[in-house]
Amino acid sequence: MKRSDKYTDDYIEQRYESQRPHYNTYYQPIGKPPKKKKSKRIFLKAIITILILLIIFFGVMYFISSRANVDDLKSIENKSDFVATENMPNYVKGAFISMEDERFYKHHGFDIKGTTRALFSTISDRDVQGGSTITQQVVKNYYYDNERSFTRKIKELFVARKVEKQYSKNQILSFYMNNIYYGDNQYTVEGAANHYFGVTVDKNNSNMSQISVLQSAILASKVNAPSVYDVNDMSNNYINRVKTNLEKMKQQNFISESQYQEAMSQLGN
């Protein structure tokens, strides 16, 4: 082979090699961006921290509320004008249950459905009843009346459960109706009935006239704002609350259709 031929072949081979595609045979792992991993870890740590704080918070609230002696509620029965619910006409009890806690006999101190319904009523301007159950209100009025805070609501829940375990529903309702403010320095349903209408809620008391369906609805509708609602000069808002209460009493079978119609005619609006 001629030397010139060799150079020619080498040139052709080099040119061929330069035109061939080259592939990277080394494995290069592609990882996730480090920022994503870091943000995920931060998020998980935040969730775990929040859960731990909530557990600690509710644990502390439970400990504090466990110190409340629910035996003390029995002292309400020592009031001179205390009347137990079993000695009242059924419609008197019904007036308060319908207005304040219509699921009273179905829950165990806290009512998720009732709270949700109350929230909806507030949003839609149909404020018919509060979000707290009657049991919670018993606890608030007796133990935490002067306390206004979110933690009070949590303590209420725990103490309300204790109250429900120790007392019957009728006892709890008696505590409620005999330890709330009706206005004009009246704190029992018997005292309020005597003061405003000259009647009694005690069906065994033959010395006074018995409270009527309408009068029961008026008192039950008053406790939401006792200093605002005036029995002797009823505002339109107060009248509408009484009407709503009477309707609910009928729906829940605390009064008959004829009792409802009679009360509505006596209301006269």
From Swiss-Prot:
UniProt keyword list: Cell membrane, Cell shape, Cell wall biogenesis/degradation, Glycosyltransferase, Membrane, Peptidoglycan synthesis, Transferase, Transmembrane, Transmembrane helix
Subcellular location: Cell membrane
Gene Ontology CC, one term: plasma membrane
Pfam families reported for this sequence: Transgly (PF00912)
One GO biological process term: regulation of cell shape
Coiled-coil ranges from the UniProt annotation: none
Gene3D superfamilies: Biosynthetic peptidoglycan transglycosylase-like (1.10.3810.10)
Catalytic activity of the protein: [GlcNAc-(1->4)-Mur2Ac(oyl-L-Ala-gamma-D-Glu-L-Lys-D-Ala-D-Ala)](n)-di-trans,octa-cis-undecaprenyl diphosphate + beta-D-GlcNAc-(1->4)-Mur2Ac(oyl-L-Ala-gamma-D-Glu-L-Lys-D-Ala-D-Ala)-di-trans,octa-cis-undecaprenyl diphosphate = [GlcNAc-(1->4)-Mur2Ac(oyl-L-Ala-gamma-D-Glu-L-Lys-D-Ala-D-Ala)](n+1)-di-trans,octa-cis-undecaprenyl diphosphate + di-trans,octa-cis-undecaprenyl diphosphate + H(+)
SUPFAM superfamilies hit by this protein: Lysozyme-like (SSF53955)
Keyword Glycosyltransferase carried by entry: yes
Listed InterPro entries: Glyco_trans_51 (IPR001264), Glycosyltr_51/Transpeptidase (IPR050396), Lysozyme-like_dom_sf (IPR023346), Monofunct_glyco_trans (IPR022978), PBP_transglycosylase (IPR036950)
Enzyme Commission code(s) on record: 2.4.99.28
Topology relative to the membrane: Single-pass membrane protein
Segments passing through the bilayer: 46-66
Pathway membership, UniProt: Cell wall biogenesis; peptidoglycan biosynthesis
GO molecular function, one term: peptidoglycan glycosyltransferase activity
Top-level EC class as recorded in UniProt: transferase
Role noted for this protein: Peptidoglycan polymerase that catalyzes glycan chain elongation using lipid-linked disaccharide-pentapeptide as the substrate.
Protein family according to the UniProt entry: Belongs to the glycosyltransferase 51 family.
Designated name of the protein: Monofunctional glycosyltransferase
The species this protein was found in: Staphylococcus epidermidis (strain ATCC 35984 / DSM 28319 / BCRC 17069 / CCUG 31568 / BM 3577 / RP62A)
Organism ancestry: Bacteria, Bacillati, Bacillota, Bacilli, Bacillales
